[in-house]
Amino acid sequence: MAGLYFHIPFCKRVCAYCDFYKSVDLRRMDPLLESMHRELDARREYLGGEPVRTRYFGGGTPSLCAPEAIAGLLDHAATLFDCAAAEETTLEANPDDLTPAYLAVLRRAGVNRLSVGIQSFDDACLKLMNRRHNAAQAVEAVRSAQREGYENITVDLIFGVPGFGNDTLRRSLDSALALGVQHISAYHLTVEPGTAFGRRAARGQFAPVDEATSETEYALVHETLTGAGFEHYEVSNFALPGFRARHNAAYWHGVKYLGIGPAAHSFDGRERHWNVASVTEYIGGAPAEAETLTDRDRFNEYVMTRLRTAEGIDLREAERLFGKERAARVLRDAEPWLKSRTLVLAAGRMAVPPARMLVSDAVIETFFETEPDTATK
């Protein structure tokens, strides 16, 4: 099974924390869509005939794209790839874009999962992050989608925001739960260079929360959501049973996927490809770059993706994929983490307990192989 990803990079305004590739020049929407259709045609053989299981529109703000244009991309893809078994089609959306009329056309087009970028139900926090909706609009967007018949809705929340502590976070979690959504992604705020927050931090006007605050807020997220019946299945992701994000799971398990649009990434099982991060250059036909994954790359990605999930590393699978020596080394390197209970080993699987997944990156680094890679081309 394979996945399709469509990158719509446009935004009406830039959020204070965002370091993804985006553009605020909405006049380029039509030329971009034409180029995306051309790319679909040009890469029709990329997935090697594998059935497409998931389709995902990310950004940027895909909900700025007319629903008819979303339908056009899906319909075109269906003529090139085997999409008959597609079971999850997700569109990322800003709350203020989700009008009843928009939702109705989108659903008829085949979108059956919405990812709503709420981030907070606190208006002051939303203003700080330069979001263009308020809490009331967020609530109404989800309710409108539910009235339209959407039964698979995920919302994004951000924690670790300076000046907004446990009480604000708890209210946002409670508000999300009260809406009856099936999935919640809770991301820790990162202050990246080149963002509004990053520039303020460089001037000494904005400071990230400390480690203790991060751990306390993460524990609150974990306890609140698991207490409400959600499965904590990946560092930042929580789902009711049966509603885990299938498209993201494809990335974590090495499934083939084709990315369409500027800055989109693809994987054909052997090589990674990525498009130029420029609307102008993409429309101009700039070729994708490529990297052949070495055995070391595949091992590092395996460790990284598995240890960010509740499933963890299946040591028998690791031995089958990478050999007995590597699997034995993983177990040896894990000893300090196992002794501290930061890693647990049960039934041949080694994982970070979900409540402690915030530290998974530090654990993952233990296992990385760092010899130089010369496979980029």
State where each predicted segment sits.
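Minor-groove-contacting beta-hairpin "wing" of winged helix-turn-helix DNA-binding domains
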Residues: R349-P353
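A short, conserved structural fragment
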Residues: L338-G348
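Short amphipathic alpha-helical interaction segments
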Residues: K324-L338
